[in-house]
Amino acid sequence: MCNVVSVTAKPLCKDDFLQKIQKISDSDTQYIILREKYFSEQEYFNLVKNVLSVCDKDKLIIHNFPETAVKLGVKKIHLPFGAFKDLKGREDFDLLGTSVHSTEDAIFAEENGADYITAGNIFETDCKKGLKGKGVNFLRNVCDSVNIPVYAIGGINADTAKELKSVNRKNFAGVCVMSLLMQSENINEEVMKIKRELG
């Protein structure tokens, strides 16, 4: 069964953010990527400290701030592709991921130590209105270009997840979901719906 990874976006969350994180942590998600891209590093550091009080540390992936991860003892990090290329201190992390938008990016990421990649955007998303999705064939091509796990990102919900069944690649590891889980009242129900559709 494919995995579901939650990607956070505090502005989309209408409820108490820490309560939402706790519910996501308690759900059948594999990881939570704490992606708050409008935060300064100090704001982000403070947020992570609070999140660690409600979230399973093994599920938490820090986004974009390696020094914060090291200071707080979080061993998983996800970096935008540009930051991934500049990373010093790969040995500080047990899990390193990056975002790719082409097969060339994917190959570079694998050759330079990424443990997994997110590939997208697969479908049109709420946060990038008007940006056409790259589609299922793009995802299949990315999977074929590398051996590491690949997660689809962009416009994923139970309906679009149905279309991903046809990817049919061993290293297709699952999906990353943002808007849906940030706004959902029934987080685990949504997660399980997506997992059922992915098969």
Model-assigned labels for residue ranges:
Residues 16-31, 67, 72, 82, ...:
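Alpha/beta enzyme core
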Residues 3-5, 30-33, 59-61, 75-78, ...:
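Structural preference for beta-strand elements that scaffold enzyme active sites
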Residues 45-62, 84, 90-102, 130-157, ...:
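Alpha-helix-loop-beta-strand connector modules within alpha/beta enzyme cores
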Residues 10, 36, 81, 100-102, ...:
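Short secondary-structure boundary segments
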Residues 6, 79-89, 118-130, 161, ...:
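Glycine-rich phosphate-binding active-site loops on the catalytic face of alpha/beta enzymes
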Residues 25, 29-90:
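N-terminal active-site wall of soluble small-molecule enzyme domains
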Residues 71-72, 76, 81-83, 97-144, ...:
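Glycine/Thr-rich beta-alpha phosphate-binding loop at enzyme active sites
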Residues 1-18, 94-100:
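Active-site mouth loops of central-metabolism enzymes
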